[in-house]
Amino acid sequence: MYLIAGLGNPGSKYEYTRHNAGFMVIDDLAKKLNIKVNKLKFKSLIGEGFIGDEKVILMKPSTYMNDSGKAILDCFNYYNLSAENLIVICDDIDIPFGTIRIKKKGSAGTHNGLKSIIYLIESQDFARIKVSVGQNDKYDLKDFVLSQFSKKEFEVLEKEIDMSSDAAIKIVEENVDYAMNNFNGKSVI
């Protein structure tokens, strides 16, 4: 079983902000897998289904970004999951726009959602799919990640979202290394 968690903030105010790229990928993945993400459980909206024979839980934590680890920990405890069964999808401001980056494990960097998860599950050993949301050199970081995309940027983001949901499927079907080799370094621009 895999828990695939897309990070973001709940509510229409944040729906199309840069910080909600993880939620957008979960929505796309749910469409591709015909899974309804509409059940309230684990401080989240979740949906359950399968990728091949592997059970998956798609999750959109409703705890707000900085407390994402609370929702994931609740699910971990309920299903007795380990870090190897977790895929986290989140926004990233450090990789080139038009790309995604898959990592097998690692630190949180500046991402508070990842910091919360690492702290609460006490492990950095989980896969993550980082979705580029553009690079910021003009604005306060908080203002930037809570801003919306321009129409032109959103067209690029939609391609990144499609690639990210495909990558999540390949991680489950194959493994993280396979997904890294097939998606890292590719640009949708």
Curated annotation (Swiss-Prot):
Residues that coordinate or bind tRNA: Y14, Y64, N66, N112
EC numbers, comma separated: 3.1.1.29
Site-annotated residues for Stabilizes the basic form of H active site to accept a proton: D91
Classification via Pfam families: Pept_tRNA_hydro
Positions of the record's site feature: Discriminates between blocked and unblocked aminoacyl-tRNA: N9
Principal location: cytoplasm
Keyword entries, A-Z: Cytoplasm, Hydrolase, RNA-binding, tRNA-binding
Active site: H19 (proton acceptor)
Quaternary structure (record): Monomer.
PANTHER family: PEPTIDYL-TRNA HYDROLASE
Family stated for the protein in its record: Belongs to the PTH family.
Full protein name: Peptidyl-tRNA hydrolase
Organism this protein belongs to: Finegoldia magna (strain ATCC 29328 / DSM 20472 / WAL 2508) (Peptostreptococcus magnus)
Gene coding for it: pth
